[in-house]
Amino acid sequence: MKINNQQRTGFGYFLYGIQLALSPEIRRFVVLPLLANIILVGGAIFYLFSHLNMWIEGWIGQLPEFLSWLTYILWPLLALTILATFSYFFSTLANFIAAPFNGLLAEKVEETLTGKKINDDGFTAVLKDVPRVLAREWRKLLYILPKAIGLFLLLLIPALGQTVGPVLWFIFTAWMLAIQYCDYPFDNHKIPFNDMRYKLKQKQGKAYGFGVLVSVFTTIPILNLIVMPVAICGATAMWVAEFKHQR
């Protein structure tokens, strides 16, 4: 595989992640994150599609009569919001379960891109590092949950929740997904969570661009099953090109 560590747009890093995930050097490290994502996200999407129409009809039914003309606009918007929410929630759960293997995937991608070893201790070191890695995932959840709860409450407000809420939720999801996946290469170098967020904010355009494309892919059936390893590969490419030299 031809290595290219040039700087890209946020979209570009995600698309490069597809190329990296399919490369011979990386493929075997993709398997476990991929399986975790298929089992959890696949099951969630199957359940979602069997209930989606009922939920949306009930939600739109809360609109005041004078806003009933918005139904045709809100139906697809609410469908995308629910899809993104479900996919994000179960992707987060899959990421939590597969966190040690996600970190290993990010490590191998970085080694492929830079030609330099990050850790020489092997798989035993990965197992020993599990408690610290899970603590980091918990730290991410503590950052995300208050904001997610606030936005969820906004969605329950008639009219406002059905119009402004989905847009704000999509923006929020894009940022959270950027944090979720970019954190793996940062964490491999033991960079504190708050420092990682600060560095991403310095390149917010690229972080949001990356998160938006990840968010879109999580709403597309079948494609959402491969998002996790692809996003990790793309986020690691972003780390190498944009942030590694800042350490």
UniProtKB/Swiss-Prot annotation:
Coiled coil: none annotated. Signal peptide: none annotated. GO terms for cellular component: plasma membrane. Keywords: Amino-acid biosynthesis, Cell inner membrane, Cell membrane, Cysteine biosynthesis, Membrane, Sulfate transport, Transmembrane, Transmembrane helix, Transport. InterPro entries: CysZ_sulfate_transptr (IPR050480), Sulfate_CysZ (IPR022985). It is a multi-pass membrane protein. It is found in: Cell inner membrane. GO terms for biological process: cysteine biosynthetic process; sulfate assimilation. Its main location: membrane. It comes from the Bacteria. The keyword Transmembrane applies. The chain crosses the membrane at residues 29-49, 66-86, 141-160, 164-186, 212-232. One of its GO terms (molecular function) is high-affinity sulfate:proton symporter activity. High affinity, high specificity proton-dependent sulfate transporter, which mediates sulfate uptake. Provides the sulfur source for the cysteine synthesis pathway. HAMAP family: CysZ. NCBIfam families: PRK04949.1. Belongs to the CysZ family. This is Sulfate transporter CysZ. It comes from Vibrio parahaemolyticus serotype O3:K6 (strain RIMD 2210633). The gene is cysZ.
